Amino acid sequence: MNRNNPNEYEIIDAPYCGCPSDDDVRYPLASDPNAAFQNMNYKEYLQTYDGDYTGSLINPNLSINPRDVLQTGINIVGRILGFLGVPFAGQLVTFYTFLLNQLWPTNDNAVWEAFMAQIEELIDQKISAQVVRNALDDLTGLHDYYEEYLAALEEWLERPNGARANLVTQRFENLHTAFVTRMPSFGTGPGSQRDAVALLTVYAQAANLHLLLLKDAEIYGARWGLQQGQINLYFNAQQERTRIYTNHCVETYNRGLEDVRGTNTESWLNYHRFRREMTLMAMDLVALFPFYNVRQYPNGANPQLTREIYTDPIVYNPPANQGICRRWGNNPYNTFSELENAFIRPPHLFERLNRLTISRNRYTAPTTNSFLDYWSGHTLQSQHANNPTTYETSYGQITSNTRLFNTTNGARAIDSRARNFGNLYANLYGVSSLNIFPTGVMSEITNAANTCRQDLTTTEELPLENNNFNLLSHVTFLRFNTTQGGPLATLGFVPTYVWTREDVDFTNTITADRITQLPWVKASEIGGGTTVVKGPGFTGGDILRRTDGGAVGTIRANVNAPLTQQYRIRLRYASTTSFVVNLFVNNSAAGFTLPSTMAQNGSLTYESFNTLEVTHTIRFSQSDTTLRLNIFPSISGQEVYVDKLEIVPINPTREAEEDLEDAKKAVASLFTRTRDGLQVNVTDYQVDQAANLVSCLSDEQYGHDKKMLLEAVRAAKRLSRERNLLQDPDFNEINSTEENGWKASNGVTISEGGPFFKGRALQLASARENYPTYIYQKVDASTLKPYTRYKLDGFVQSSQDLEIDLIHHHKVHLVKNVPDNLVSDTYSDGSCSGINRCEEQHQVDVQLDAEDHPKDCCEAAQTHEFSSYIHTGDLNASVDQGIWVVLQVRTTDGYATLGNLELVEVGPLSGESLEREQRDNAKWNEEVGRKRAETDRIYQDAKQAINHLFVDYQDQQLSPEVGMADIIDAQNLIASISDVYSDAVLQIPGINYEMYTELSNRLQQASYLYTSRNVVQNGDFNSGLDSWNATTDTAVQQDGNMHFLVLSHWDAQVSQQFRVQPNCKYVLRVTAKKVGNGDGYVTIQDGAHHRETLTFNACDYDVNGTHVNDNSYITKELVFYPKTEHMWVEVSETEGTFYIDSIEFIETQE
């Protein structure tokens, strides 16, 4: 087929390459479709799946008007609207050919240059010459790449084979890459940003071509040989580019409006023209971008552009004054805001005009007999969509001299005559005659036919599209009367025509063969408290808004399909809060919950809106039907915006086929080409969701397919478990005795049987003050490979302040704040299995498909699926270098529900990544070596100190001379060891954990022996005054690890009674210090009144007449042979302050 020959029709060859024959299509059950599967295993079955083979091309006559860029923009939008009404694959090549011939009619960039010149004139700003050259060069390149792609696509469609598929895939990727690299030249790159407004049309048209291209991967990718993962990447790129392109166009359009805003009539005219022409050239196109989503609109849709277009006011306004006749644009008496308020209506429901009644009045010029009958006012009769009720609106001065125009069948163009009538004393701006096509004529009545006049036609500003583009929907009016410069009076009666697209379905017809769009601005009525607000620029029209519960509005529709047909409902909306809605279809209601989509007081951007499909099905009971939307309960102070309803027809047979196709795609995309392993980018969550899709297949229709797919997906699950380096991924045992299993705090629970996880899920409660909620696990180094990338995958249902850490010789930190926006309206299917996962899976998939996957880490923190990567180094055998997986919530209002956790090997590092890791690893090893040397020194000192505590090598007997001070000295040495924990709060071991643990255990043994041999209970005061009898003016204080008794008054006293072995040798050892005057006493006494006292005073710090530091503790001891079993120890002082670190009374050998 020749793309450039509009009279040539395409002939499709008979099907081949495994496609079904005509007999198979006509008699689908004539032979057993399962026979071929009887002796297959799942790998052989999956190899038979190559995707969808669908394609039929239509070549309509092409219409090109390269001289009028406004006409070009209108033609493109009109053709796209028609294209979107049918399944995408049907006419792609001819459709692309039309677009390229519109934009490059003569293989040069004349149309694109005209796009730029058009806006340059409107905003009175020239684009930089270098920017123009760069843009035109890039456009030429894009055109050439597109031509090459279309040639390859057409050749492949005519006779597909592997070589042609490879060629078209290569050219597709080349064209996609070309768009990505060249789009910055059209207003977003650093060199062109200053000219973004003047480049807006170029940007929008180029973005449109790019988005149309990306959808081809979804239509043809499987047939080209792309893996499902690759197709998903292109799909995600399409969704992300739709967001980027839409937001740029809206922001640039609004900035352009602000740039041309002024204060007078001339500035308002420029503002008005910019608004109109950019709507036709760019913003209408932007509103169609979402409809290129093949997954959401596989069989076409009927997008509706409900926005209004205002042509220029009908007033005498030639390029220059003519004699005494003055052009209206130069007048100083109409302000910008006055004109905007008079000519531009507030947002309102969509309407059609039934009747226009024009009133006429006669104006006679002062001092003469010259007169003119002019349009002084009018009355409009209109009605809302599919609503029989009519209402009237009047403007200007209503008189008995009227001319009636019946516009029920539409008014598509108007020729008008504007006059500036009068003389030096007074003049009038008015309209004297008009011709409404095809409705009728209002003839001119005047006796001064040769006075200043200007004939205006709406088709100059609003070109027709195949004579079927626009309908007159309203007429606004400006009436003014002013006296300026003495007796000169100026009167003005100025109408402005308002237009809507004729292809907007005024009867809201619902069909069974495509998705029906029902914009809420086409409601027949709205509830009290609902307001119509200006659309955000990308919805194609205005939208509805509510700030409290109640009725949103009612849409009246006509069902042009069998009443047995079932449908699903989608609602496109934006909201600052989660809320519940009821959709009433006639008298039956369906309720569902909608999550919030935007922050309070946030602006309405593309990503603020969400399209949610409700799993409940509906059926219309009559052809004339109503759909009423209610919000409850109260949402006071919040904002809800509703854009449109989508009515999605259900074809059971087709949906069953699509379900099988989706299941095949999902399962096939899990495996590598050989079907022996999982693809690296496949997650455990995706395996579970593929299993759900397979489980939902019909046993009757696809029994053998289902059996094979179940076998395959079970194999995938086994492979997923085998590659998962985490132990116990199902959380069967937490805090078990296994060394490397899950360790968790309080507040971690396991849930099972929920709607969002096929397996078990983790729930982390909020932290308690300084105690985080956590769960962690160590992956042993023996299971890891050096210089390899590993990935932690998971799925978060919802979370706030969830911290996910991967710790190796460095830490990778991720915070997830995932909104609770996965709405589940699922219910039990009546079986013992509980949840209806078929319905649940469909709904969750729709929501996840709509979820952005941005590269920005702040935005990525909100996605439900997550991946976190970490690299291993050389796995130094001298250091335990496993990978710690840590999940924790450290805030008191945080929480998390997540599951499908897996740590998998991605592959060996190479190139720059390997070099960077080797450099980082070398630095880390060097730092570890330095720390190890310092730690070894401390370790040896601490080990020697602990050795001195014992008299044997088995640490079973404490040296008699050892006191608490010796134990504390050793403890301080151990405490100075660094890098004991990677995370001190969770006590995750660090590189020095083992030696620290070794020394700490020995010290603990020494402390135990010390406590055991001391017959004085709590002699180190670590338990305060437990076991002691004390007066109220005594206390135990703490300094670091030391606890000490403090007596600060002469009458303070502390004592204790204990038992001993009579007539054995004991040593009383006291470590204390005396501060100030007086003495401190520690006295020991038995039941025979035999007593000994250790005295502490200032003289203790005089050594050979030299005073030493009196802040140090001194140890004194004495030997005592008790005569009785009962003993007493007493502590007192005479004045000053007495500090006692420890009191020991220990039995010793003779």
Curated annotation (Swiss-Prot):
<dbReference type="InterPro" id="IPR005639">
    <property type="entry name" value="Pest_crys_dom_I"/>
</dbReference>
<dbReference type="InterPro" id="IPR008979">
    <property type="entry name" value="Galactose-bd-like_sf"/>
</dbReference>
<dbReference type="Pfam" id="PF03944">
    <property type="entry name" value="Endotoxin_C"/>
</dbReference>
<dbReference type="InterPro" id="IPR036399">
    <property type="entry name" value="Pest_cryst_cen_dom_sf"/>
</dbReference>
<dbReference type="InterPro" id="IPR038979">
    <property type="entry name" value="Pest_crys"/>
</dbReference>
<dbReference type="Pfam" id="PF03945">
    <property type="entry name" value="Endotoxin_N"/>
</dbReference>
<keyword id="KW-0749">Sporulation</keyword>
<keyword id="KW-0800">Toxin</keyword>
<dbReference type="GO" id="GO:0030435">
    <property type="term" value="P:sporulation resulting in formation of a cellular spore"/>
</dbReference>
<dbReference type="InterPro" id="IPR036716">
    <property type="entry name" value="Pest_crys_N_sf"/>
</dbReference>
<dbReference type="InterPro" id="IPR001178">
    <property type="entry name" value="Pest_cryst_dom_II"/>
</dbReference>
<comment type="similarity">
    <text>Belongs to the delta endotoxin family.</text>
</comment>
<dbReference type="Pfam" id="PF17997">
    <property type="entry name" value="Cry1Ac_D5"/>
</dbReference>
<dbReference type="Pfam" id="PF00555">
    <property type="entry name" value="Endotoxin_M"/>
</dbReference>
<dbReference type="InterPro" id="IPR041587">
    <property type="entry name" value="Cry_V"/>
</dbReference>
<dbReference type="GO" id="GO:0001907">
    <property type="term" value="P:symbiont-mediated killing of host cell"/>
</dbReference>
<protein>
    <recommendedName>
        <fullName>Pesticidal crystal protein Cry9Ea</fullName>
    </recommendedName>
</protein>
<dbReference type="GO" id="GO:0090729">
    <property type="term" value="F:toxin activity"/>
</dbReference>
<dbReference type="Pfam" id="PF21463">
    <property type="entry name" value="Cry1Ac_dom-VII"/>
</dbReference>
<dbReference type="GO" id="GO:0005102">
    <property type="term" value="F:signaling receptor binding"/>
</dbReference>
<comment type="function">
    <text>Promotes colloidosmotic lysis by binding to the midgut epithelial cells of insects.</text>
</comment>
<dbReference type="InterPro" id="IPR005638">
    <property type="entry name" value="Pest_crys_dom-III"/>
</dbReference>
<keyword id="KW-0843">Virulence</keyword>
<dbReference type="InterPro" id="IPR048645">
    <property type="entry name" value="Cry1Ac-like_dom-VII"/>
</dbReference>
